[in-house]
Amino acid sequence: MIGRIRGILIEKQAPEVLVDVSGVGYELQMPLTSFYELPELGQEAVIYTHFVVREDAQLLYGFVSKQERSLFRLLIKANGVGPKLGLTILSGMTAGEFVACVERDDIATLVKLPGVGKKTAERLLVEMRDKLKSLMEASVGSEREFMLQSNYKASEVVNTAEEDAIAALLSLGYKPAQASKAVSSVYTDGMSSETLIKSALKSML
């Protein structure tokens, strides 16, 4: 099982990245909360991974922290939550924010995420409450540290920033009209794709 990789980041197209490890390119799908934490292209990245083998594919999911990976593993064990929905949840909120939702029984916030209806949100709150006991203190305690360490540097802005942002939101399950409206409402000149995606997601929660 592949638990961690370290290599040069050679491609970034949210939510997917390509990392060169000794000449071998590893494709990973990452929640946007982790994607934002990645270094610039050409720099070394350390990514914790979760490997999934299916009949038709072998998929590698990446996370910048063990904490986020642990939460992802708990999420996909919940009834009705697969890897895709797990990524969507962790793209819409940090691990600490999800833990806070569970603590507060905050269904209203969860149902704003694509693919999470009222029944799914209620089931998540019930199932995750017990499973999160081992992660609760670490998640909440480190939330401030993660926020302070986050450094969303604007990369070189290209004409496709809006297109990239819309594509990323569509890949998470948002409808075209939702994605386009959210991106248009927050876009300002000079925004990078990553900053635009982050702002658009926040506007929908």
UniProtKB/Swiss-Prot annotation:
Keywords: Cytoplasm, DNA damage, DNA recombination, DNA repair, DNA-binding. Residues 65-143 are annotated as: Domain II. Residues 157-205 are annotated as: Domain III. GO terms for cellular component: cytoplasm; Holliday junction helicase complex; Holliday junction resolvase complex. The keyword DNA repair applies. GO terms for molecular function: ATP binding; four-way junction DNA binding; four-way junction helicase activity. Residues 1-64 are annotated as: Domain I. This is Holliday junction branch migration complex subunit RuvA. It comes from Shewanella pealeana (strain ATCC 700345 / ANG-SQ1).
